[in-house]
């Protein structure tokens, strides 16, 4: 059984966004925010005028626009927003919704194809690379969204909204918490004829690599690999690409625990006669878990397949096993604040001629296995993907910002509001059930699996015995029969009371495929954590550039959109910036301090004069450092108000911190890649202080601030 995120064992899901641990009703009934002492030592001070923070604030902020804070009000809103067709509420970017808009654009000749064949998606004038290598292969079955994006890409119309950098693997041995040092430049070896390297069956005791054994980064160009250049070189020489940065060797598979089976690296054309990158369009059923404990990654990837425009940002459509095939592919990920293009060859780990890790339900399709390989390269090896959170992968796939919800501490109506509002705004959702530290991914009697990552793909209000019932559709990335078996599960008695037309409208399918429906009540009672990935206006702008579809013109009403700023920073004991939390009052002021000022349009200011803000701190390179025995640190963040007239041009002092409480903060320091704080305050100037729990812990981090307004920031 696959091992779920080790980070779960370390209480990664203890919500870092809960400022003071109040439930929502306590917040409504009592203005005293000091119900429970935070683990951070701070002096008590009066609550800032006009400011809201804590769990109560977060819950209250979610109800904006619903007209009420009770469950029935939220359900009425869901019924009003239900599409006229009767389909479940998802969001306009979901594959079916986006495809309908693009289909109409193609039908109305809004988009004029110039560089690809609109019938089959073939690139005009492309070389059939498979003719060289006798690997077979068929054309990709791109939908119209993929075809329009590919045509725009070939015309040079895409890429203005998002700068993508060539990926340069870091040398972990030289990582010194400053800017990561690139590998020593070297000339990559010329590609040679394809082979299938064999890794002998490992010994019982893992073998450590020799001290003088070169790492995969030793042969990396200082500038990284360029996909077009490398592919053209291979086509010209009639050779298949072999990645010098991520070779088909044991070093790419593991650093500590070798696979149990004898691994043979094979190209798709050596596994099956007619491989395809994508068959019949990408689908959430294309993602099935293999021998690696990366269900967190699979859950996010399955979620992304629901959004054509987001999917093709990760999997550029200008590659296939037919046109210009040369054994080389590339994929794009958000990586610590910037987008990178990761180039890989198509040699994949196999056992008995079957893919060993992630694979598609269709054995002729290979996009998901290749994405996993590129993601493994991004983080230094396949074993580095063992254990994580869906939130982490969702951010790397979208560039969005993810929040955690501890469902045990959240109001039911607020969680439903988050689901409805999030679906309307294009947010992505994941969820899980806390697992016992000694039992990995145990299946409960109701069919759900503890410590396992699920994705939430739809929400729908249905009439059952005259009463409104809210249903959620969930997806288990294992893609098998391990599904919910309670009310509204596949083939349950509840569905017999629903007419066939309604079931067809909301796409109800009874199959052992890992997808199932359940009531919101059962979801709230059984799941303990939920993750929401928020997307910015810039992401939607790029999607409009890719597809010609403007979100604002397709939604029922203009929704508020997030705007973002990012700042790089580091906690360095060498530079005197690793001050630790406020339990260390003498060193705490040494932490990096960021002055943030934001203004907001009138439409973003809510009735009480406040604006919703999300602050996130993400620590870098910790997954890559696992091979050196280092993992994520417990981190937190505090936000301080300078008042209506206050300004800051230099770092705040120990005296300031002793006399002022933060207006928002993380009270639980969590050993996770990223922590977030959501709060509501008037527009103005605030100082953000990210920190580790212990002083003198070294790490680099990325600070992000989301708000419905104009943002400015600087390091004090």
Swiss-Prot record:
Keywords for this protein: Hydrolase, Protease, Thiol protease
A Pfam family this chain is assigned to: Peptidase_C2
BP term (GO), one: proteolysis
Region annotation (Disordered) ranges: 31-53
CDD domains: Calpain_III, CysPc
GO molecular function, one term: calcium-dependent cysteine-type endopeptidase activity
List of catalytic residues: 295, 452, 476
Assigned EC number: 3.4.22.-
Protein family (similarity comment): Belongs to the peptidase C2 family.
Function: Calcium-regulated non-lysosomal thiol-protease which catalyzes limited proteolysis of substrates. Promotes starvation-induced muscle atrophy.
Protein's UniProt name: Calpain clp-4
Organism field: Caenorhabditis elegans
Lineage summary: Eukaryota, Metazoa, Ecdysozoa, Nematoda, Chromadorea
């Amino acid at each position: 059984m696959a091992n779920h995120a080790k980070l779960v064992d370390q209480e990664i899901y203890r919500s870092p966004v809960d400022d003071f641990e109040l439930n929502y009703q306590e917040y409504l009934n009592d203005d005293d925010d000091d119900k429970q002492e935070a683990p951070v030592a701070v002096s008590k001070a009066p609550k800032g005028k006009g400011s809201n923070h804590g769990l109560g604030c977060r819950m209250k902020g979610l109800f904006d626009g619903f007209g009420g804070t009770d469950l029935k009000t939220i359900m009425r809103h869901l019924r009003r927003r239900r599409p006229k067709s009767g389909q479940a509420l998802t969001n306009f970017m979901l594959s079916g919704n986006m495809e309908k808009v693009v289909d109409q654009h193609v039908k109305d000749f809004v988009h004029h194809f110039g560089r690809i064949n609109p019938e089959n998606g073939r690139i005009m004038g492309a070389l059939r690379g498979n003719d060289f290598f006798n690997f077979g292969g068929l054309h990709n079955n791109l939908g119209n969204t993929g075809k329009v994006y590919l045509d725009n890409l070939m015309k040079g119309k895409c890429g203005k909204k998002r700068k993508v950098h060539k990926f340069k693997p870091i040398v972990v041995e030289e990582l010194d918490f400053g800017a990561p040092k690139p590998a020593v430049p070297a000339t990559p070896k010329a590609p040679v004829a394809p082979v299938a390297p064999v890794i002998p069956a490992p010994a019982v005791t893992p073998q450590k690599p020799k001290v003088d054994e070169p790492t995969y980064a030793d042969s990396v160009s200082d500038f990284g690999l360029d996909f077009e250049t490398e592919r053209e070189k291979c086509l010209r020489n009639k050779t298949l690409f072999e990645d010098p940065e991520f070779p088909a060797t044991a070093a790419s598979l593991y650093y500590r625990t070798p696979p149990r089976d004898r691994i043979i690296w094979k190209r798709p054309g050596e596994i099956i006669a007619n491989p395809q990158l994508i068959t019949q369009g990408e689908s959430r059923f294309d993602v099935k878990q293999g021998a690696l404990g990366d269900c967190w990654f699979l859950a996010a990837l399955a979620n992304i397949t629901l959004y054509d425009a987001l999917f093709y940002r990760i999997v550029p459509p200008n590659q296939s096993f037919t046109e210009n095939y040369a054994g080389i592919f590339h994929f794009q990920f958000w990586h610590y604040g910037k987008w990178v293009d990761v180039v890989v060859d198509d040699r994949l780990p196999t056992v008995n001629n079957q893919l060993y890790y992630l694979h598609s339900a269709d054995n002729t399709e290979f996009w998901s296995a290749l994405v996993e390989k590129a993601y493994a390269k991004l983080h230094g090896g396949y074993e580095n993907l063992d254990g994580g959170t869906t939130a982490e992968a969702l951010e790397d796939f979208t560039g969005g910002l993810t929040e955690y919800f501890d469902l045990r501490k959240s109001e039911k109506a607020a969680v439903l509001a988050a689901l409805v509002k999030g679906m309307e705004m294009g947010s992505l959702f994941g969820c899980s059930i806390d697992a016992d530290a000694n039992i990995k991914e145990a299946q409960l009697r109701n069919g759900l699996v503890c410590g396992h990552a699920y994705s939430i793909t739809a929400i729908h209000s249905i009439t059952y015995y005259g009463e409104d019932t809210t249903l959620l559709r969930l997806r288990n990335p294992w893609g098998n029969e391990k599904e919910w078996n309670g009310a509204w599960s596949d083939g349950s008695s509840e569905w017999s009371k629903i007419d066939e037309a309604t079931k067809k409208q909301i796409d109800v399918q009874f199959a052992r495929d890992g997808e199932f429906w359940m009531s919101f009540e059962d979801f709230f009672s059984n799941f303990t954590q939920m993750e929401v990935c928020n997307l910015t206006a810039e992401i939607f702008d790029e999607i409009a550039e890719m597809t010609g579809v403007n979100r604002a013109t397709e939604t029922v009403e203009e929704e508020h959109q997030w705007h973002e700023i990012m700042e790089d920073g580091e906690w360095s004991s060498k530079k005197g910036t690793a001050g630790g939390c406020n339990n260390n009052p003498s060193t705490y002021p040494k932490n990096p301090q960021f002055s943030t000022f934001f203004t907001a349009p009138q439409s973003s200011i809510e009735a009480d004069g406040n604006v919703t803000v999300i602050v996130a701190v993400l620590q870098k390179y910790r997954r890559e450092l696992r091979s050196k025995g280092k993992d994520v640190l417990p981190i937190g963040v505090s936000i301080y108000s300078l008042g209506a007239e206050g300004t800051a041009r230099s770092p705040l002092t120990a005296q300031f911190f002793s006399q002022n409480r933060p207006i928002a903060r993380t009270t639980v320091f969590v050993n996770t890649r990223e922590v977030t704080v959501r709060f509501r305050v008037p527009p103005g100037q605030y100082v953000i202080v990210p920190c580790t729990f212990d002083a003198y812990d070294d790490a680099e981090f990325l600070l992000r601030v989301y708000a419905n307004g104009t943002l400015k920031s600087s390091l004090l």
